[in-house]
Design a protein with these regions (language model features):
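A detector for short, charged/polar N-terminal pre-domain segments
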Residues: 1-11
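Short amphipathic helical patch at the helix-1/turn junction of helix-turn-helix
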Residues: 10, 21-22, 51
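Short basic helix-loop element that most often maps to the first helix and adjoining turn
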Residues: 14-33, 59
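Conserved hydrophobic/aromatic packing and binding residues within compact polymer-binding modules
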Residues: 16, 30-31, 41-44, 71
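Recognition helix of helix-turn-helix/homeodomain-like DNA-binding domains
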Residues: 36-51
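DNA major-groove recognition helix of helix-turn-helix/homeodomain DNA-binding modules
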Residues: 55-70
């Protein structure tokens, strides 16, 4: 069960990376647009942060001009 949870959280990072790259935004630029540290963005995308808060996801979604649902869907 934990493996499934980890896979879904890794999916969030992969979705963020995909959306960010589709928009041509660097990790550094996304961190500034979302008012988050670069380290936070890097950790989420790489799977190092397996528990991003809804506040963090909302900031990222707003910066990418997408819905939070777009970050968490498979």
């Amino acid at each position: 069960m934990a493996k499934s949870s980890n896979n879904s959280k890794n999916l969030i990072g992969k979705n963020i990376r995909k959306l960010r790259q589709e928009k041509g935004i660097s990790q550094d630029r996304l961190s500034k647009l979302a008012d988050l540290s670069l380290n936070t963005i890097v950790n989420i995308e790489s799977g190092g942060n397996l528990n991003p808060t809804i506040e963090t996801l909302t900031k990222i979604a707003n910066a990418l001009e997408v819905k939070v649902d777009d970050l968490i869907r498979s």
